[in-house]
């Protein structure tokens, strides 16, 4: 796959297991706003989609209440949640190898950009990325728009860019942005190749090491 110049990674469920921090962000927001409990499946469904969509769907919030709950979520994320994450086994080594092979590396995440930057710095991998693009407080960006920002910063076009991600949101974002998609099944979204194959893709990786083999 030497045609690629820029490899863009999703964060949650692709680069790192961020579930503990995300779940604790939700619990903090629930406590602060006295929200009812939700099921484990509903909790897990918060990983991947835009934050406001998850709170709208699972807690039926809107307007000022929605803004308040997102504020509490972000409050926990920036003070504690960003430290409650761990890189998937082999990912740090993969990023180092890809960088040495001359790829430009980027992150496109619906997580708040400040949180993502601080988290990846804490995990000691921020230095591998040319750009980290995430959600902004005053601007709602779709996955495809974030991918466009990454490509623009890295000076690459659609034909030379690839997104690695673990969910249908990633696959649809790549399709909308006009770039290739590599699905992974070790994260929170896809669980097998059949699910990945429901979307246009150039491959499916069950482990981090398989990403490296596919890109070699």
Q: Where would I find each of the regions flagged by the language model?
A:
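N-terminal helical cap/lid subdomain that shapes the substrate entry/recognition surface
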Residues: 2-93, 101, 114
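Conserved Lys-Pro-Asp/Glu-containing loop-to-beta segment of HAD-superfamily phosphomonoesterases
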Residues: 6, 143-171
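Acidic, Mg2+-coordinating phosphoryl-transfer loop and its flanking beta/alpha structural elements
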Residues: 163-203
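Conserved H-loop
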Residues: 36, 125-130, 157
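Surface-exposed amphipathic alpha-helices with a cationic face
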Residues: 92-99, 171-175
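Substrate-recognition element of Asp-dependent hydrolases with the DxDx(T/V) motif
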Residues: 26, 94-120, 135
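A short, structured active-site edge motif that brings together acidic residues
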Residues: 126-141
């Amino acid at each position: 796959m030497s045609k690629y110049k820029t490899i863009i990674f999703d964060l949650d469920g692709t680069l790192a297991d961020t579930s503990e921090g995300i779940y604790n962000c939700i619990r903090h927001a629930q406590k602060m706003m006295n929200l009812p409990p939700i099921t484990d499946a509903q909790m897990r469904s918060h990983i991947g989609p835009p934050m406001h969509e998850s709170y709208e769907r699972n807690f039926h919030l809107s307007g000022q209440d929605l803004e308040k709950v997102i504020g509490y979520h972000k409050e926990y994320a920036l003070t504690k949640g960003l430290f409650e994450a761990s890189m998937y086994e082999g990912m740090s080594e993969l990023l180092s190898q890809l960088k040495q092979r001359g790829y430009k590396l980027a992150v496109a995440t619906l997580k708040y950009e400040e949180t993502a930057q601080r988290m990846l710095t804490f995990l000691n991998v921020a230095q591998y990325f040319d750009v980290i693009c995430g959600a902004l407080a005053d601007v709602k960006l779709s996955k495809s728009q974030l991918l466009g920002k990454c490509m623009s910063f890295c000076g690459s076009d659609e034909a030379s860019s690839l997104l690695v991600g673990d969910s249908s949101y990633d696959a649809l974002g790549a399709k909308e942005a006009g770039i290739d998609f590599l699905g992974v099944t070790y994260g929170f979204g896809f669980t097998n190749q059949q699910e990945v194959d429901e979307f246009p893709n150039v491959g499916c990786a069950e482990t981090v090491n398989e990403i490296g083999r596919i890109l070699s």
